[in-house]
């Protein structure tokens, strides 16, 4: 196919008036057929639609079964979003040699699904496992600075509950157990906050029932993460410590019993609510712990990040440090992909950074992602089913969906919030964001 002829028709020009550049296509995607390594002489006015047409025709010429697809194009580490001429000028691309263009299968932009008003600033948000388009069970779980819990099902129906406790600013949450029963019956989750406690709640007959209170931190609890079999939780605090908690209902070893006499009312309450102390306390950070995640490749290990500019891998059984990453700023969040094992991080600046914690040079930044404009990135979350994609949310009021193959331009910008975005989650084809504008926005991804 001669792309120059197409350009002449569209622009009313002749091939003599068009500047040209030589390009070749390639792909690292194993799901794509082999792309012919032919060199094409194309006009620099060509845009993505023109390159899509050329590439599809090229593949069809060698593969009769090929069905046309939409591609995204990368030059180096930047997505091509303009004409070749504009891209070459903006990024000062050398055109004396053949321009190599990487092809990846295109995806649709995230679609707004629900916009939920919360009673206060949204401090944490989770997307539940196993609740897909075919179910109407709850998908989104969130907490607020006012002590509220907001639960949203796939159709956007809201359930708002309150912990009804003084000084109960909630800062973090984790889903412990979900059920397929109506009215959320039997759902369990753990929350932590300003009062230095974590609490495990169960929903019974549409109401919150306090099951376990976890006592041990000396300042506000900033983060919590539940392991895959929901038997352990790890938390981090402004007190700079990590604590590991036993969630197993049959556990007796970490139950705290006060020796002094208690009122009959308190005794009655204790029949329903247990107080537990930590299994392990780990010190090692020098400032508040802002995020914790379980290690996907090593049982009994976890990662934490802190405002002391470090990410640390811990052996929880030995209560010792395994490795340490030193960052340029205070860390605000981390997430580790379950299959690639790469660690994405955010700091008190506008740049998400990628690390490989399993590599000997894991403390070195693999990539820095440039795109947020002001303030800092509050949270980053991987797409658990695609090791190339993650989302970042920022105090600049935007969320950005990234592909790790492009560090200089995001896949999509997600707008809608009117104030700082404080938290994010990505699971089951849903991105959820929570903001200081007192709203939770839910987007559907392809």
Swiss-Prot record:
Instruction: Write out the ranges of the annotated region (Disordered).
Output: 256-275
According to the record, the residues making up region (Ubiquitin-like (UBL) domain) are 21-105
Give the molecular function GO annotations. ribonucleoprotein complex binding
**What is one term from the GO cellular component aspect held by the record?**
PeBoW complex
Alphabetical GO biological process terms: maturation of 5.8S rRNA from tricistronic rRNA transcript (SSU-rRNA, 5.8S rRNA, LSU-rRNA); maturation of LSU-rRNA from tricistronic rRNA transcript (SSU-rRNA, 5.8S rRNA, LSU-rRNA)
Which of UniProt's keywords are assigned here?
Nucleus, Repeat, Ribosome biogenesis, rRNA processing, WD repeat
What are the WD repeat spans here?
171-211, 216-255, 284-324, 326-365, 371-412, 416-446
Q: Where does the record locate the signal sequence feature?
A: none
Subcellular location(s) of the protein: Nucleus, Nucleolus; Nucleus, Nucleoplasm
SMART domains xref list: WD40
| PANTHER family per the UniProt record, alphabetical | RIBOSOME BIOGENESIS PROTEIN WDR12, WD40 REPEAT PROTEIN 12, 37
Role played: Required for maturation of ribosomal RNAs and formation of the large ribosomal subunit.
Q: Which family does it belong to?
A: Belongs to the WD repeat WDR12/YTM1 family.
- Name of the protein in its database record: Ribosome biogenesis protein WDR12 homolog
What is the species of this protein?
A: Caenorhabditis briggsae
């Amino acid at each position: 196919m001669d792309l120059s002829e197409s350009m002449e028709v569209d622009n009313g020009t002749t091939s003599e008036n068009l500047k040209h550049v030589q390009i070749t296509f390639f792909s690292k995607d194993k799901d794509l057929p082999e792309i012919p390594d032919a060199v094409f002489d194309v006009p620099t006015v060509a845009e993505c639609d023109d390159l899509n047409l050329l590439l599809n025709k090229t593949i069809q010429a060698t593969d009769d079964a090929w069905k046309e697809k939409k591609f995204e194009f990368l030059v180096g580490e930047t997505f091509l979003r303009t004409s070749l001429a504009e891209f070459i000028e903006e990024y000062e691309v050398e055109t004396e040699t053949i321009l190599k263009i990487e092809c990846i299968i295109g995806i649709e932009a995230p679609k707004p699904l629900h916009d939920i008003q919360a009673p206060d600033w949204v401090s944490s948000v989770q997307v539940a496992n196993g609740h897909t388009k075919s179910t109407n069970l709850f998908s989104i779980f969130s907490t607020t600075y006012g002590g509220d819990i907001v639960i949203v099902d796939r159709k956007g129906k809201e359930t708002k509950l309150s912990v009804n406790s003084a000084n109960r600013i909630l800062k973090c949450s984790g889903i412990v157990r979900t059920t397929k029963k109506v009215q959320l019956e039997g759902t369990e989750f753990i929350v932590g906050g300003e009062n230095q406690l974590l609490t495990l709640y169960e929903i019974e007959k549409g109401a919150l029932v306090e099951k376990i209170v976890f006592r041990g931190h000396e300042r506000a609890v900033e983060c919590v993460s539940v392991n895959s079999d929901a038997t352990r939780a790890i938390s981090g605090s402004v007190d700079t410590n990590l604590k590991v908690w036993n969630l197993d209902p049959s556990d007796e070893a970490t139950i705290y019993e006060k020796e002094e006499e208690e009122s009959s009312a308190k005794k009655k309450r204790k029949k329903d609510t247990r107080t537990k102390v930590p299994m392990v306390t780990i010190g090692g950070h020098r400032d508040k712990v802002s995020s914790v995640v379980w290690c996907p490749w090593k049982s009994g290990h976890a990662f934490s990040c802190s405002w002391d500019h470090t990410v640390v891998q811990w052996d929880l059984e030995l209560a010792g440090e395994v490795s340490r990453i030193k960052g340029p700023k205070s860390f605000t969040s981390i997430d580790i992909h379950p299959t690639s094992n790469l660690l994405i991080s955010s700091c008190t600046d506008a740049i998400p950074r990628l690390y490989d914690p399993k590599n000997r040079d894991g403390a070195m930044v693999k990539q820095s992602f440039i795109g947020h404009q002001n303030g800092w990135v509050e949270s980053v979350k991987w797409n658990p089913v695609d090791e190339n994609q993650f989302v970042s949310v920022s105090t600049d009021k935007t969320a950005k969906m990234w592909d790790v193959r492009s560090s200089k331009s995001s896949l999509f910008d997600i707008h809608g919030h009117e104030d700082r975005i404080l938290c994010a989650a990505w699971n089951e084809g849903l991105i959820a964001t929570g903001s200081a504008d007192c709203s939770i926005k839910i987007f559907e991804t392809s």
